[in-house]
Amino acid sequence: MKCVEVYKELYHQEPFDVAFCPYRISPLGAHIDHQYGKINGLAIDKGIHMAYHPKQNGVVELQSLNFPKRAQFFVSAVPDEKQGDWADHLRGAAKMLGEKYRLKVGLSGIIEGSLPIGGLSSSASVIICFLSALCKVNGIHLEPMEMILTAKAAENQYVGVSCGKLDQSCEVLSKKNHLLYLDTKDDSYELIPTSEKMKPYKVAIFFSGLERSLKNSKYNLRQDECKAAAYALMGYAGMDYDTFANTRLRDVPFEVFEAYKERLPELWRRRAEHYYSEFARAEKGAELWRKGDLEGYGQLVFESGKSSIYSYECGCDELKKLYEIMTDTDGIYGGRFSGAGFKGRCMALIDPDKAEDIEVKVTTEYLKAFPALNGKYSFHFCESADGVEL
């Protein structure tokens, strides 16, 4: 790992340890975790590594191999306001952890992401990787749900991204060769083993060549549109409702949506249509995975991608082109945008025997459409993996 070599060169010592947090994919359940929907997810064998060593003076000193500028702050005196750089995720993590535990020991470290930024929950991976190291040097043990909620709070309350808990849950709870089936309303989950009847598969990652940050996207706006739809539907139906901030589409039965959907503004109706259809796909997908029906599962993933484009209305021209190519490529069982879907990448479940042909076809057609991205676009094969070690 390059982070280890850079650490040794910079600090003239071996790192104390190397923390790792996997990236994740979510084939089904896209854009509904923040509405307390159900999701399907997998951790993959690519992610964030951090070579580090404790600092007894309480200073956190971190450098990223993916971003400029070294981060430095006292673990017990994190700035109250974000600084607007990549290290806000680290400051937020320390801030949230420090609200529950006394932090005395800092650390020096080098952080390295194994894939380009965007669409694989890299921000959540950075936070969880850092939290696991910070906990270790301070003698703190977090249970899985506590790690998930601490990492989520760092993004929500400090970075300013209104994410749900899909990313963190996949990265913490996942198990190799299993599908995580999670209800984000009550945090109940099931790890569904890959059936012996299921055909072999690999995860393919198509990086568009465009990196993105949720802070400047329409990610938060889409959530507000979902909440607005829920709030209006509850009002039309005469239901009891809470504040706008505490309202979710999960609070609204599908029958209420069907009865009053024509009264919603078109954009709000589309967002709600995506929520209800994606919720159903996540439920059906779990059953198909249990049965080993990879073709049927893949078709649901393609349907999810279509709904993200036309009902949730995310995606840029480049991601839409990748999706279009995937739907017409032999050997791809199913694919869609990965992550928020405003830039970043697409993911697919593929037939391993056709991996080389898939790589050639997708790459050729994509770069024919966007030649300026030659050298930035990339293709990666991954396997399912265990979640972070706590």
Locate the predicted segments by residue:
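Glycine-rich phosphate-binding loop
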Residues: 342
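C-terminal nucleotide
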Residues: 1-28, 49-83, 178-334, 349-390
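Gly/Ser-rich oxyanion-binding loop with an adjacent helix/lid
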Residues: 1-19, 25-38, 74-77, 83-195, ...
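Short Gly/aromatic-enriched secondary-structure transition segments
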Residues: 36-43, 222-223
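Short, charge-rich binding segments
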Residues: 40-43, 51-54, 101
